[in-house]
Amino acid sequence: MDSNTVSSFQVDCFLWHVRKQIVDQELGDAPFLDRLRRDQKSLRGRGSTLGLDIEAATHVGKQIVEKILKEESDEALTMTMASTPASRYITDMTTEELSRDWFMLMPKQKVEGPLCIRIDQAIMNKNIMLKANFSVIFDRLETLILLRAFTEEGAIVGEISPLPSFPGHTIEDVKNAIGVLIGGLEWNDNTVRVSKTLQRFAWGSSNENGGPPLTPKQKRKMARTTRSKVRRDKMAD
């Protein structure tokens, strides 16, 4: 096992513990709390994958951080903070939309790289809007927190979320997953639009009809998803 992978996990565990103390003292806002909950799931998955105990890793992570802070000068810290751009948290969804439980009449789940796509195949002939909460850096999507598909009535009919056991994803991973989700929804004659905020930070542009400017590769992925469903339906008949 790579030592950097282990030390990164240990430091992440300790930093999560510090952030938890901030929340316990009621000093964190809603986005801070949301990231804390999702990072907890991610750490549990990573710990299981690496075979490491989170409590023990937290103690080692504390030692690593204390050693770095002891050697770090205030001047170096100021220079680092000044040269590192800060990420922003973008919220398409309200706290209620983000935390609401939902269920599927005809569930389908697909793993696309480090992301999990869930869709209710019972939904037909609906106008659907994709909205997401995510972080942004350099005016580009950095990390997807959660994406959900909503009908005009407000029902949740689809979702894209990071896999807790597979930390890290790229903007291309997110766009590919969105392409698969759109393909699955459009197969049932639904009309799918993407929020302007998500279009702007994922694709760098917005489309008036709400459709994302998918690349040829993403369109081929949508087509493959649709064709595989056609074959399964024929076999079922």
Curated annotation (Swiss-Prot):
Any one GO MF annotation of this record: protein serine/threonine kinase inhibitor activity
Spans annotated as PABPN1-binding: 223-230
Main location, first listed in the record: host cell
Subcellular locations according to the entry: Host nucleus; Host cytoplasm
Post-translational modifications reported in the UniProt record: Upon interferon induction, ISGylated via host HERC5; this results in the impairment of NS1 interaction with RNA targets due to its inability to form homodimers and to interact with host EIF2AK2/PKR.
Alphabetized Pfam families for the sequence: Flu_NS1 (PF00600)
Superkingdom in the source lineage: Viruses
Assigned GO CC terms: host cell cytoplasm; host cell nucleus
Motif Nuclear localization signal, chain ranges: 34-38
Basic residues bias locations: 217-237
Motif (Nuclear export signal): 137-146
GO terms for biological process, alphabetical: symbiont-mediated suppression of host cytoplasmic pattern recognition receptor signaling pathway via inhibition of RIG-I activity; symbiont-mediated suppression of host gene expression; symbiont-mediated suppression of host mRNA processing; symbiont-mediated suppression of host PKR/eIFalpha signaling; symbiont-mediated suppression of host type I interferon-mediated signaling pathway
Region RNA-binding and homodimerization, residue ranges: 1-73
Ranges where the record places region CPSF4-binding: 180-215
Record key words, sorted: Eukaryotic host gene expression shutoff by virus, Host cytoplasm, Host gene expression shutoff by virus, Host mRNA suppression by virus, Host nucleus, Host-virus interaction, Inhibition of host innate immune response by virus, Inhibition of host interferon signaling pathway by virus, Inhibition of host PKR by virus, Inhibition of host pre-mRNA processing by virus, Inhibition of host RIG-I by virus, Inhibition of host RLR pathway by virus, Interferon antiviral system evasion, RNA-binding, Ubl conjugation, Viral immunoevasion
Family annotation (HAMAP family): INFV_NS1
Family statement: Belongs to the influenza A viruses NS1 family.
Protein purpose: Inhibits post-transcriptional processing of cellular pre-mRNA, by binding and inhibiting two cellular proteins that are required for the 3'-end processing of cellular pre-mRNAs: the 30 kDa cleavage and polyadenylation specificity factor/CPSF4 and the poly(A)-binding protein 2/PABPN1. In turn, unprocessed 3' end pre-mRNAs accumulate in the host nucleus and are no longer exported to the cytoplasm. Cellular protein synthesis is thereby shut off very early after virus infection.
Assembly with partners or alone: Homodimer. Interacts with host TRIM25 (via coiled coil); this interaction specifically inhibits TRIM25 multimerization and TRIM25-mediated RIGI CARD ubiquitination. Interacts with human EIF2AK2/PKR, CPSF4, IVNS1ABP and PABPN1.
UniProt free text on domains: The dsRNA-binding region is required for suppression of RNA silencing.
Protein name per UniProt: Non-structural protein 1
Originating species: Influenza A virus (strain A/Swine/Colorado/1/1977 H3N2)
